[in-house]
C-alpha cells in the first residue's frame, strides 16, 4: 500500500549538467535513509546523493554517464512501512508529503542514529565516520559518569590537522562510564562511553512536544507539516537555540560524511536544526553560496570577520604600536595596493616551485664591458639583463611550455616573445614589457629598457607598456643576495630571478680558477611545468649565458 515517490537531485548549486559517475542501487534493493543512491562529480567536488528516507527501490531512472541537474529524477522509491503510516492522516494531500522529502530526513537522522536503544538498556557510544583519520586526539571531554544528557549533546571534541569537531550523542540517557580522556587518540569505531539509554523516552519526548495527533514516534511530524511546515519547525528550533551556547554546531555522522564528500569544512556551516544541528540542507545551502560567488556569507561571516577568511587562519593580531614608542602611519601607494593584491593572489593560487642554479658569465661580462666601451659615445649602456632577455627568448623557443598560459582546461601556447622585467620605483614594483624581443638585438633592448625604466620611475608608464608579457625576469643584480623565490606574474607560468654575481673558484681540470658566477632562481607553475622540464630550462639558460654563441644555434 505504500506509494512510490520520486527521489530527485537536490539543490547542488548552479550546475545544470553534472555527470553521474556511480549508481549505488538497483531495482529491488532495500535502502535506509541517508544511504547513497548515486555519486555525482562536478569540476570542483564529488558528492553522493543520499536517499531522504528508507524504502525499496522500484526503478532506477539514470545510469552512469548521464548528466543531471537539480530536480532530475534518480529513482522511484516505495517508502518503508514506518514512514508509510504518515500518509494516512494526510490522505487529502499526499503531494506535499512527497514534494518535501528534504526537510523530513533532518529530524529523522537523530532517531536513526540510535536504533539499538531498547527500553533502558546500556549502549556503547562510539566515534562515528570521521573520514580517513586513524589517530585523532581528544581535546575535550564534555561529560562524566552520572551525567544526564540529551540526544545531540556533545560528548567529546576531537581535533584533526584540518578541523575541530564535536561528537554528539546519538540519543539521550545517563552516562554510566567514560572510556576516553583528554589526549587519547581515537578513530572510527573507538568506544567513547557507556550510556544507559533513554531512547524510549528521550527521542520521542522531543517529538511529542510538537505533535499531538498520534503516539507513534516519527509519524506525527509530517502531519502538522502539511498545514504549516515553517511554523512547525520554528518553535522546535527556538527553544533549542536558546539552550545552546553557540560555540560549536553539531552534525550527525551522515551529514559529516555528506559535507566531507563535497569538500566542505562542516565547522563553517551554520546549523538550523534542533540544538544548532547541521542538516544536509544547511550543507547544500553553504555549497550553493560558495559556487555562486557569494562566499557563503552566513556560514563564513564569523570566520572571515575574524580576519582568517577562507584560509581558516588565526585572526590577524591588532596592536597599539604607540604603547612601545613613537610611530608614523603612511598610506600605501596605489601601486603597492594593486601589486600587493595581485602578488598575494598569485602566491596563493599558483603552485609555485623554485629551481636554483648558477651560470658562469665570465666571458659574457667581459663582452658586455667591451660593448659599453665601444658604445660610450652613443650613450647606450648594455646591462646583463639585456643579454638575459635574449637568452630567455632562445630558451622559450626550445621549451614552449614556458611561453604559455592556462585558460581553463586549455594551455595557450604563444608564438610571440614579450619579456617583462621588474622595475623598482619609489611607489612600488612595476613590470614593463619588451615587445617582440626575438626581433631585437642586445643594443636595441638595452636602449628600450632604459627608456621604460625611466618612465616607470617617473610614473608615466602606459598600461599597454605593462601588458602582454610571456615571461618575466626579476633582477636583484645591483643589490646583492644569492637566491630567492620570485612570485610568478600571472597569467605567465614562470619567472626568472637573478641575484648579484660573485667570484667563485672552479676546478678546470688542472687548477682552481676564478669564475664570475650568476645565481639563478626559476619559479614555475607546477600545473603546467614538470620538475625535469624546469631543470632542463634552467640548465639551458645557464649554458646560453656561459657561451652566448649558442644563441645562434
Swiss-Prot record:
Active-site residue numbers: 526
Pfam families: 2-oxoacid_dh, Biotin_lipoyl, E3_binding
Cofactor: (R)-lipoate
Start and end residues of each Peripheral subunit-binding (PSBD) domain: 250-287
Residue stretches making up the Lipoyl-binding domain: 4-78, 122-196
Residues passing through the membrane, by range: none
GO biological process, one term: pyruvate decarboxylation to acetyl-CoA
Known catalytic reactions: N(6)-[(R)-dihydrolipoyl]-L-lysyl-[protein] + acetyl-CoA = N(6)-[(R)-S(8)-acetyldihydrolipoyl]-L-lysyl-[protein] + CoA
GO molecular function, one term: dihydrolipoyllysine-residue acetyltransferase activity
CDD domains from the UniProt entry: lipoyl_domain
GO CC term, one of those recorded: cytoplasm
Family note: Belongs to the 2-oxoacid dehydrogenase family.
Function: The pyruvate dehydrogenase complex catalyzes the overall conversion of pyruvate to acetyl-CoA and CO(2). It contains multiple copies of three enzymatic components: pyruvate dehydrogenase (E1), dihydrolipoamide acetyltransferase (E2) and lipoamide dehydrogenase (E3).
Complex and partners: Forms a 24-polypeptide structural core with octahedral symmetry.
Protein name according to UniProt: Dihydrolipoyllysine-residue acetyltransferase component of pyruvate dehydrogenase complex
Native species: Cupriavidus necator (strain ATCC 17699 / DSM 428 / KCTC 22496 / NCIMB 10442 / H16 / Stanier 337) (Ralstonia eutropha)
Amino acid at each position: 500500500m505504500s506509494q512510490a515517490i520520486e527521489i530527485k537531485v537536490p539543490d547542488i548549486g548552479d550546475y545544470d549538467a553534472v555527470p553521474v559517475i556511480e549508481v549505488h542501487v538497483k531495482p529491488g534493493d532495500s535502502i535506509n535513509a541517508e544511504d547513497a543512491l548515486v555519486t555525482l562529480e562536478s569540476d570542483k567536488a564529488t558528492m553522493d546523493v543520499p536517499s531522504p528516507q528508507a524504502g525499496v527501490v522500484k526503478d532506477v531512472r539514470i545510469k552512469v554517464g548521464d548528466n543531471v541537474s537539480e530536480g532530475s529524477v534518480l529513482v522511484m522509491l516505495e517508502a518503508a512501512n514506518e514512514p508509510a503510516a504518515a500518509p494516512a492522516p494526510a490522505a487529502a494531500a499526499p503531494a506535499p508529503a512527497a514534494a518535501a522529502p528534504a526537510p523530513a530526513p533532518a529530524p529523522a537522522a537523530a532517531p536513526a542514529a540510535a536504533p539499538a536503544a531498547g527500553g533502558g538498556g546500556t549502549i556503547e557510544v562510539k566515534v562515528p565516520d570521521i573520514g580517513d583519520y586513524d589517530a585523532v586526539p581528544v581535546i575535550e571531554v564534555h561529560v562524566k559518569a552520572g551525567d544526564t544528557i540529551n540526544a545531540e549533546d556533545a560528548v567529546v571534541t576531537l581535533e584533526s590537522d584540518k578541523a575541530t569537531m564535536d561528537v554528539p550523542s546519538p540519543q539521550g540517557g545517563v552516562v554510566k562510564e567514560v572510556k576516553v580522556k583528554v589526549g587519547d587518540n581515537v578513530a572510527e569505531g573507538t568506544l567513547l562511553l557507556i550510556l544507559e539509554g533513554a531512547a524510549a523516552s528521550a527521542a520521542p519526548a522531543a517529538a511529542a512536544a510538537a505533535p499531538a495527533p498520534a503516539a507513534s514516534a516519527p509519524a506525527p511530524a509530517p502531519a502538522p507539516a502539511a498545514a504549516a511546515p515553517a511554523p512547525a519547525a520554528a518553535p522546535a528550533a527556538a527553544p533549542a537555540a536558546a539552550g545552546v551556547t553557540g560555540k560549536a554546531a553539531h552534525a550527525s555522522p551522515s551529514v559529516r560524511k555528506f559535507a566531507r564528500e563535497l569538500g566542505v569544512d562542516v565547522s563553517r556551516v551554520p546549523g538550523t536544526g534542533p540544538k544548532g544541528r547541521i542538516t544536509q540542507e544547511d550543507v547544500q545551502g553553504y555549497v550553493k553560496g560558495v559556487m555562486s560567488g557569494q562566499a557563503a556569507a552566513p556560514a563564513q561571516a564569523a570566520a572571515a570577520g575574524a580576519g582568517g577568511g577562507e584560509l581558516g587562519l588565526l585572526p590577524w593580531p591588532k596592536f597599539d604600536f604607540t604603547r612601545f614608542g613613537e610611530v608614523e602611519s603612511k598610506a600605501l601607494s596605489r601601486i603597492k595596493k594593486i601589486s600587493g593584491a595581485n602578488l598575494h593572489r598569485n602566491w596563493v593560487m599558483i603552485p609555485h616551485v623554485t629551481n636554483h642554479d648558477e651560470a658562469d658569465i665570465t666571458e659574457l661580462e667581459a663582452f658586455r664591458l667591451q660593448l659599453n666601451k665601444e658604445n660610450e659615445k652613443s650613450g647606450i649602456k648594455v646591462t646583463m639583463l639585456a643579454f638575459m632577455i635574449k637568452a630567455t627568448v632562445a630558451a622559450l623557443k626550445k621549451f614552449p611550455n614556458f611561453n604559455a598560459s592556462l585558460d581553463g582546461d586549455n594551455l595557450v601556447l604563444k608564438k610571440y616573445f614579450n619579456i617583462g622585467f621588474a622595475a623598482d620605483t619609489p611607489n612600488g614594483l612595476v613590470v614593463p614589457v619588451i615587445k617582440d624581443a626575438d626581433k631585437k638585438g642586445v643594443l636595441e633592448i638595452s636602449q628600450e629598457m632604459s627608456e621604460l625604466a625611466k618612465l616607470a620611475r617617473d610614473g608615466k608608464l602606459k598600461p599597454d607598456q605593462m601588458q602582454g608579457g610571456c615571461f618575466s625576469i626579476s633582477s636583484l643584480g645591483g643589490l646583492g643576495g644569492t637566491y630567492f623565490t620570485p612570485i610568478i606574474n600571472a597569467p605567465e607560468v614562470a619567472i626568472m630571478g637573478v641575484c648579484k654575481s660573485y667570484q667563485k673558484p672552479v676546478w678546470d681540470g688542472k687548477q682552481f680558477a676564478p669564475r664570475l658566477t650568476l645565481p639563478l632562481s626559476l619559479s614555475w607553475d607546477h600545473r603546467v611545468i614538470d620538475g625535469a622540464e624546469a631543470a632542463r630550462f634552467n640548465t639551458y639558460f645557464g649554458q646560453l649565458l656561459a657561451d652566448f654563441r649558442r644563441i645562434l644555434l
